[in-house]
Amino acid sequence: MSGDYILNEDGTLRKPHVTPSVPTMNELAFQFNETGAEQAARHFIDLINYSWASGDTTALDEFSEERCTYCQVISQRIHDVYDNGGWAYGLKYTVSQVEGNYPVKTDTPETAQFTDCYVMSFLMHRSKADRYEPPTLEHVPAGTGRLIPIVHWDGSEWKMAEAGGEDIETAQSE
């Protein structure tokens, strides 16, 4: 054994047994307003947590619009770890505080593409976790950061249009 982890026959570390379930969206998310937007953004965070725990990004990718580069980066980072025999254990993001939640003003060329969108600011907490990328086991410390999600209402449901933040992006690779 290596620490609390069991070695496989090939010398790699076996991932601890976890059986996460694909998160379902809160009923309050099925409305085009501030509450629905916040619940959709929280669902996105739940999907990130599920994807890191399972290695399965299907639900995350389906919830993300093609234009969401942040979503693509997270999905690819998870694939980079899991597709090469690695895993993450204990990694969880939680919203500590909602600092803002507003409809996007689309009166500038930079924001015109965000019709029917809400932008939020979340103060986030990241749990301490272990990430294994053969042959390295890394103990990722707990941390905080800010996530700025933009969710889009397509007329019947929310999708993640874009996101960004400070420290939260680098949390994926610390």
Question: Model segments located where?
Answer:
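Short, mixed-charge, low-aromatic patches
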Residues: M1-D4, K15-H17, Q31-E34, Y102-T108
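A short, amphipathic edge element
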Residues: N84-D107
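Compositionally biased, low-complexity repeat tracts
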Residues: L7, S96, H139-P141
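Exposed beta-sheet edge and beta->alpha loop/turn motif
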Residues: Y102-E174
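Core segments of small alpha/beta cavity-forming domains
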Residues: T12-Y89
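A mature extracytoplasmic/lumenal domain signature
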Residues: S64-R67, S75, Y93, F122-R126, ...
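Amphipathic, hydrophobic N-terminal targeting peptides for secretion and organelle import
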Residues: M1-V22, G165-I168
